Each structure stands twice: as structure tokens, then as C-alpha cells.
């Protein structure tokens, strides 16, 4: 299965009538493996900040999490495993695997829990597969 198929079929899939607004699979070096059409362009410093927060949990909390120039308030995640952010009625979930970052962006009516489930389920599967 191609990386694009993982984005299209596993991240952008419909869940309880809803789906993510944007999603991507990105290497730890910031290279985009696959993304939805609506996913914003990631800046190198944004990826560096995300990786740093996984290595040193809490570093993004004071400044916020930036993805494609959009600022998200960092909310409770799983230190070193999952970063979650909130912006208005939407938000973001980022799951770190051994080689990649699985990123899902959502807006209402999708719920944070639905986003977390979609992103973390694929992340857990890729970890099991060695990615």
C-alpha cells in the first residue's frame, strides 16, 4: 500500500459520518510522505518544534503548536507519544512513530476523540509494522 493510500483510506476515512479536514504522514526530517489536498505546507521550524516537544515534552506549551502557520493551543496529550492541539472549534492530533509523524486536523462537527482515534490507530499500526 502506498503512503498516499494510508492518508486517503485510513486518515481521511469517514467515521460516524465525519472525516478529518486535513491529514499527512511526514518523516522526522520534515519530508512529506503523503498528504491530503487540504493539508497546509509545513515549515522546517514547525517540524523541528514538534520533534523537540516529543523529545522534551512541554516545550511547545508556552508558545503554541504551529502547523502550516496556524497556531494551536497545546492540550493534554501523551508525553513523547501524542501531541494534541486546539484552535476554536477544531484542533490537531500528532502521533509519533519510529520514522514518521501522523498528523490529523479536524473541525466541528468532528470531535477531538474521533480525530484521536483515527490518527492514533494508524500510528499504532505503523509502529507495529516497524515504521
Curated annotation (Swiss-Prot):
Keywords: Actin-binding, Allergen, Cytoplasm, Cytoskeleton, Disulfide bond, Phosphoprotein. It comes from the Eukaryota. Its main location: cytoplasm. Disulfide bonds join 13-115. One of its GO terms (cellular component) is cytoskeleton. Transmembrane segments: none annotated. The keyword tRNA-binding does not apply. GO terms for molecular function: actin monomer binding; proline-rich region binding. PROSITE patterns: PROFILIN (PS00414). Phosphorylated by MAP kinases. The modification Phosphothreonine is found at residue 111. Binds to actin and affects the structure of the cytoskeleton. At high concentrations, profilin prevents the polymerization of actin, whereas it enhances it at low concentrations. By binding to PIP2, it inhibits the formation of IP3 and DG. Has a high affinity for poly-proline. This is Profilin-4. It comes from Zea mays. The lineage of its organism: Eukaryota, Viridiplantae, Streptophyta, Embryophyta, Tracheophyta. The gene is PRO4.
